[in-house]
């Protein structure tokens, strides 16, 4: 694996942890030279993931429980969203006796920016709140209080809270 001592695509670094660029990581994974361990939590992976056989999901929150399932003799690339959690897990794996570990420099964001394969259920742009889309009249909520022809017919003094009544 083509690794470096310093990251190029992220700021967070732990001395002793090696980094690998997304393109080099993809080549190593595709050629069965390494396995990719995704340490993002399951809810993150359900939104966006890498559709390759050599990708294992071992969330950071349970990584210590998963150590028996990770072979110490294989080359391991660790990935998270931006490279911070994966650096920490790569460091942990080294301390636990895994000699061939590298952090995916820049994380999943760098992987996507390199236009490598991934699947997503998120919209192409935006944060998911649809605020970047054109607002169309049929998508707007009609609030009767803001409509004078309707709100003039409502007697707000007689409105009361509906309570659960037991019979």
Roles of regions detected by a PLM:
Residues 78-80:
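Short, surface-exposed ligand- or partner-binding patches at beta-edge/loop junctions that are enriched
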């Amino acid at each position: 694996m083509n690794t470096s001592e310093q990251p190029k695509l992220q700021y967070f670094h732990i001395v002793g942890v090696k980094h690998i660029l997304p393109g080099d990581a993809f080549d190593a994974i595709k050629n069965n030279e390494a396995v990719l361990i995704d340490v993002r939590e399951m809810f993150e992976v359900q939104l966006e993931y890498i559709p390759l056989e050599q990708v294992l999901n071992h969330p950071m929150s349970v990584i210590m429980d998963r150590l028996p399932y990770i072979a110490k003799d294989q080359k391991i690339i660790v990935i998270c969203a931006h490279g911070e959690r994966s650096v920490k897990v790569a460091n942990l794996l080294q301390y636990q006796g895994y000699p061939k570990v590298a952090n995916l420099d820049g994380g999943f964001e760098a992987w996507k920016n390199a236009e490598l394969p991934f699947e997503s259920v998120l919209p192409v742009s935006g944060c998911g709140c649809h605020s970047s889309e054109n607002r169309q009249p049929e998508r707007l909520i009609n609030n009767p209080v803001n409509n004078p022809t309707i709100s003039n017919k409502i007697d707000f003094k007689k409105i009361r809270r509906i309570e659960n009544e037991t019979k």
